[in-house]
């Protein structure tokens, strides 16, 4: 698969390269493309790339010496038995002293597991050997908890050394769609499953129908993604069963903290740490209405599975593991036939629309400078009054309210009228008193002529078809 997006991340890395001494920490969940980003960055630079593995420290030093030997084209280095990391780092510092070099240590947490003192060793190497010798250091790792503890935390020996950090997230829909040769509907449905995780996307690049790709990659016992959530959680947490229970409860439609607790038959105080960890890992998101002025302390929070594939897995795979173990994949395909597009994809489409809106604003195709993009729902009744896309432009005192329709029919005036009614809620008008309201309708299937005519006469009504502003 070709390299996609990551413009901002590459800009950060190139800016750090221009510094006197850049120390960058890159972290993020597995499969998200950290190594691919690094290799794209170093492809035209003098770079030492070392991938740590689960091996003894002596073996790691021997392999690192091999990297140094091949990069410097000095075969003698691979024959030396190094016993001190400082000596290895000195080779990097001495290589082409007048040329900027990049040293990458990928899967850094494995070195810490082998030797807990490695962060202190690296701190000493950076301070005494690397920092003032034209070296840019990149530490990378997938074990988010360990990267935070050993590379970013206040009590880490490396604290204060980093000059930048990148938490790599899945690709946005707009970046993925721009690089694909797919129809909008095909792209949305694929993204609803992969969530923009590059490794997952690799398995959905064929011309075969999506349902066959799902059967082969996800539903087959031998499929790459059949047990993916197990692998992800087992690497990051010590009691995966508790985290599984939380994810299952949320996937079953329990989004309030109290409901999650009731489903698990536990006090909310007991499950809060699990939710916090799942949020840190990027598997769960805590949403609050756009009206909340202090989101972190809001009592109106709702929790959702933010990882599209994990949401798909808990909806269509986990409940049918017994049947799938017996190679009965048809039962899942029948279940998908009931609501995959109407509910599962339609839900993912809402977050896709928020991304599309942000991108259209960034490009200047919508005259709006969002300070915050989210959604809104009535504070009493979960799901009663819901606005899919809600954004605030505090600079110009404007409020954007959008409705997303993922169905085959063109959107009609009735949808606009209903959105206007929602926009007059007492809570919204009180929270954004004096703000001008701009309405937006998102559709994959276009709009009726009557609605198009109405939008032509109303500058505060914006129609977005697929990923572009609709203009008559």
Where are the predicted features?
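Phosphate-binding site recognition
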Residues: 1-334
């Amino acid at each position: 698969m070709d390299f996609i997006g990551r413009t901002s991340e590459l800009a950060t890395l190139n800016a750090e390269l221009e510094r006197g001494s850049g120390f960058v920490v890159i972290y993020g969940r597995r499969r998200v493309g950290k190594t691919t980003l690094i290799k794209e960055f170093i492809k035209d630079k003098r770079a030492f790339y070392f991938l740590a593995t689960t091996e003894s420290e002596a073996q790691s030093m021997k392999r690192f010496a091999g990297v140094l030997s091949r990069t410097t084209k000095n075969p003698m280095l691979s024959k030396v038995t190094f016993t001190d990391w400082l000596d290895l780092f000195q080779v990097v510092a001495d290589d082409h002293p007048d040329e900027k070099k990049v040293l990458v240590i990928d899967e850094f947490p494995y070195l810490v597991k082998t030797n807990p003192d490695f962060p202190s060793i690296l701190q000493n190497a950076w301070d005494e050997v690397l920092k003032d010798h034209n070296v840019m250091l990149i530490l990378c790792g997938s074990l988010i908890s360990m990267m935070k503890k050993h590379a970013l935390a206040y009590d880490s020996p490396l604290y204060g050394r980093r000059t930048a950090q990148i938490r790599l997230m899945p690709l946005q829909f707009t970046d993925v769609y721009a690089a694909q040769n797919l129809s909008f509907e095909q792209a949305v449905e694929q993204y609803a499953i992969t969530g923009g995780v590059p490794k997952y996307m690799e398995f959905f690049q064929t011309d075969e129908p999506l349902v066959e790709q799902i059967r082969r990659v996800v539903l087959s016992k031998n499929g790459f993604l059949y047990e993916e959530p197990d692998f992800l959680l087992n690497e990051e947490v010590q009691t995966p069963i508790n985290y599984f229970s939380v994810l299952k409860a949320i996937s079953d439609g329990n989004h309030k903290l109290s409901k999650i607790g009731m489903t698990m038959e536990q006090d909310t105080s007991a499950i809060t740490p699990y939710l916090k960890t799942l949020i840190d890992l990027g598997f769960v998101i805590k949403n609050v209405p756009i009206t909340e002025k202090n989101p972190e302390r809001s009592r109106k929070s709702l929790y959702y599975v933010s990882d599209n594939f994990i949401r798909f897995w808990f909806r269509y795979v986990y409940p049918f593991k017994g049947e799938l173990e017996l190679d009965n994949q048809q039962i899942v395909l029948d279940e998908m036939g009931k609501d995959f597009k109407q509910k599962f994809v339609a839900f993912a489409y809402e977050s896709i629309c928020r991304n599309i809106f942000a991108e259209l604003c960034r490009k200047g195709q919508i005259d709006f400078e969002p300070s915050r993009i989210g959604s809104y729902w009535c504070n009493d009744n979960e799901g009663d009054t819901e606005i899919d896309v809600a954004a605030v432009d505090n600079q110009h005192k404007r409020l954007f309210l959008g409705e997303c329709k993922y169905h085959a029919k063109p959107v009609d005036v009735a949808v606009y009228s209903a959105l206007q009614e929602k926009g007059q809620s007492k809570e919204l008008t009180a929270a954004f008193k004096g703000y001008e309201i701009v309405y937006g309708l998102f559709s994959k299937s276009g709009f009726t002529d009557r609605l198009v005519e109405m939008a032509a006469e109303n500058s505060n009504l914006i129609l977005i078809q697929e990923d572009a502003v609709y203009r008559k």
